[in-house]
């Protein structure tokens, strides 16, 4: 198994998630809300995933590498998507944030929020964007 290639792929996908956080960051700024949940999440993802995406790899991507990459991508995208929810302070635990993120990226549509409209506009946009990205 080509572990370096899998890690490089994971880093690149997580960088795409970090890039997609720029949209709700803009929504937060537009509505005068705190951009910190998104800025912090983007910073964490850049610090952890940029070195992975720049890693040198050998040739060859095999079927088992693909299976490992897809499984790990689902897990890591859910964790990365939970970061803005967590840093916003609008959720009671990281488990709730992870559930909300996984629900979005898998297009399940389930939520733990009793009053969705009470969340900030940036977080609502991020929640909607996770559902849209999951549907792609």
Mark where each language-model region is:
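Membrane-proximal intracellular helices of multi-pass ion channels
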Residues: 1-136
